A protein has these predicted regions:
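Divalent-cation
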Residues: 3-421
């Protein structure tokens, strides 16, 4: 990384020197192109973001993300869209936002982002950025407002389509952690910029051709699967996805381990973990799943109430991950213990990037450069072949880890389900 020169008035980047290597910016553009070109993803064909614009947004957003407001990390979202193209963009994409123009545009700079960030919720608003007419500078011309992304347990059925606003299908750079950026379009995550490197998102990590095959194998042993089949799998998958997203938002790094109930006593005997905190009763997720599958009595309101209850129980589970130590669950998502210490010898085998159901994966995953949390989890999975683990990094990615065979582990570098941001 090389130095930058700042203008004292705008704190904009004016140096012809750059922060990040060209290959990183190009990798972001290539990831966008690859995602758009893939037939199975059904993306709308649109122009590829230009190199200079990607660099300006990434570098300005990165610098802004390093700042704090009253000792808290700032969050914000930048969407690249020319003001005079908004009507055409909304018409062709079928996605609309509540567009609010500034009377006077603000220069795109670290200073302007820091001033505006507290006034907007990055889950519901992106600051609209365009290249000025002179082609040399960029400016923030307004705000694009939309409804936050919903999932099974917090969506409200029966909405009025014409009154719903959605994320724009344009290059969007979001910051939720210092030095960590999300690169997305609409609700689809293209990748994360973390530690000066770009990590492509894993498309559909819970698909059967990806990490999902290991989860499905466990789910097939559950009594609820025998009772309700694929409907149970879909609810289970969405519950796990929601749990991981809540853990990511509530903790500064965490480990979640799923252990088959039938193997728990064996691993206890082998002292593969040291319990710290245990409760004497369950949260009752399984019973709520049954009621949701079999249908609540009454109308739609009963369905919404059940989903809300499941959401609250998952939030309770997620909060337990905020203390030091791993969160241990059965593979049916029942709580075993939290604040747990994992015990296993150092893994001597190979760690590969897991398949992504679209032909990717298979490269060596360089885990040795990661911290203790990742490596202790890798060691644990190396000795507990029927377990599944997730490591939520402080800088954003959620990594999934399983054992493929006695000499090989698979790791998915970022397994945020559906690439939703």
């Amino acid at each position: 990384m090389v130095g930058l020169r700042f203008d004292n008035q705008t704190r904009s980047c004016h140096s012809n020197k750059t922060m990040f290597e060209d290959r990183i910016i190009q990798d972001i553009i290539d990831a966008w192109q690859h995602d758009q070109d893939h037939l199975e993803r059904g993306r709308r064909q649109r122009s590829i973001p230009d190199f200079d614009s990607v660099r300006v947004l990434i570098e300005t957003a990165f610098l802004a993300s390093l700042n704090r407001e009253e000792d808290r990390s700032i969050t914000f979202s930048l969407a690249l869209l020319q003001r005079d193209e908004i009507d055409e963009e909304q018409r062709t994409s079928g996605r609309s936002q509540l567009v609010m123009n500034f009377e006077i545009a603000e220069p795109l700079s670290v200073e302007s982002i820091l001033k505006l960030a507290p006034a907007v919720d990055s889950e519901m608003t992106s600051l609209a950025v365009e290249r000025r007419d002179d082609g040399a500078q960029y400016q923030i011309w307004g705000a694009l407002n939309y409804s936050p992304t919903t999932k099974r347990f917090n969506e409200i059925p029966g909405v009025i389509p014409e009154l719903i606003y959605t994320r724009p299908d344009v290059l969007t750079i979001s910051s939720r952690q210092p030095g960590s950026l999300l690169v997305s379009r609409a609700n689809n995550l293209i990748g994360r910029f973390v530690g000066g490197e770009f990590i492509r998102a894993t498309p559909r990590p819970f698909a059967s051709g990806s990490m999902g095959s290991f989860l499905i194998r466990a789910v097939h042993t559950h009594s609820l699967y025998n009772r309700s089949g694929n409907e149970y799998w879909l609810i289970y998958r969405d519950a796990l996805d929601y749990l991981l997203s809540e853990v990511a938002s509530r903790s500064h790094g965490a480990t979640i381990v799923l252990i088959p109930q039938r193997s728990l006593q064996h691993y206890e005997h082998e002292r593969r973990f040291t319990y710290e905190y245990r409760f004497s009763r369950e949260l009752g997720l399984r019973d709520l799943f049954i009621r949701l599958i079999e249908g609540p009595p009454g109308s739609m309101s009963g369905q919404i109430a059940l989903r809300k209850l499941i959401e609250e129980r998952l939030q309770l589970l997620a909060q337990l991950s905020a203390i030091d130590g791993a969160l241990l669950l059965t593979d049916e998502l029942d709580l075993i213990s939290f604040g747990v210490t994992l015990n296993a010898p150092v893994w001597e085998g190979t760690v590969l990037i897991g398949p992504d159901a679209f032909g990717g994966g298979g490269d060596i995953f360089a885990h040795t450069k990661l911290g203790t949390r990742h490596n202790s989890t890798i060691d644990f999975i190396g000795k507990c072949p029927d377990c599944v683990a997730f490591v939520v990094s402080e800088d954003g990615p959620i990594r999934g880890i399983v054992q493929r065979d006695s000499s090989t582990l698979l790791c998915w570098p970022d397994c945020t389900e559906s690439m939703f941001v």
